[in-house]
Amino acid sequence: MPHYTGPLLTRDSADTLRRAHDKGAADWQGSLDLGRSQDTVALDADGFHFRGQAYPWPGKLKDRTLYYWDGEDFAPISRYSGSLIKLVPTEWGAPTFEIDGIKMLPTSKLSPFEDARRKVELVAPAGKIILDTCGGLGYFAACALEAGVGQIRSFEKNADVMWLRTLNPWSPDPDSASAGGRLQFSHGDVSQQIEQVASNSVDAILHDPPRFGIAGELYSQTFYDHLARVIRKGGRLFHYTGAPNKLTSGRDVPREVAKRLEKAGFKAELALDGVLAVKR
């Protein structure tokens, strides 16, 4: 799917453009792609010009919502297919996303992109073949590509999340020159697709599943046994667990995960907000 290259608006950025025009400015300099680049945007009574194309002034925009040009109007980047999936702006530039109002990436202390970079560094991706089990917005894959990964194979179960990626300038484009053919991105349920991955075929694994209550199969012993099967001896696995409240959940999910990974054939320890494991 081709990636969108038009303007992305928030209520704040649209208001900033309007104020600049109302003060008599003929143009405005800044970012309309969530901080990925800086542009000079021409302003007039009818709207603004971005990268050679004219756009009308948007109507009233909502807070905590990103808008893209759909060919006729500025539309929110959200879809409903049983669940409401939405791309959400952050103060850091790189957006997060929500499913039914539940934030899927941490953003309170640092950018979700920088958070992904810290985790990717744990598996030392340079030159390696990596399995990225739950692609999401692709921040693990993007950071691995930046770090010189040899090849990364990524799965995403939700077609609407894949659509979000095409509108997010922070998500990697498998067809881009910078990816260089190293990112293989597939629509599929990794709990099933893992059975087709050859044994001893990957050097490292990045596993960022939804929380246990949504995707328990991705925390199962059966799935961990498959991860142990496909990764080579000495290979590193980072498993995101988050830090669920033990008092309210009654469970210590990180330690449960570590115990199952040990049983599957890894040496596991708690790291960041998850578990780092090495195949024995």
Question: In which residue ranges do the predicted regions lie?
Answer:
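Conserved alpha-helix/loop element of class I SAM-dependent methyltransferases that forms part
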Residues: 110-128
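Conserved SAM-binding loop of SAM-dependent methyltransferases across substrates and taxa
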Residues: 137-149
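N-terminal auxiliary segments of SAM/dcSAM-dependent transferases
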Residues: 1-90
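A short glycine-rich, Lys/Arg-flanked "PGG" loop and its adjoining helix->strand segment in the class I
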Residues: 219-233
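Conserved class I S-adenosyl-L-methionine
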Residues: 126-137
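Class I S-adenosyl-L-methionine
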Residues: 243-280
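Conserved beta-strand signature within the Rossmann-like core of class I S-adenosyl-L-methionine
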Residues: 234-242
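S-adenosyl-L-methionine
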Residues: 155-199
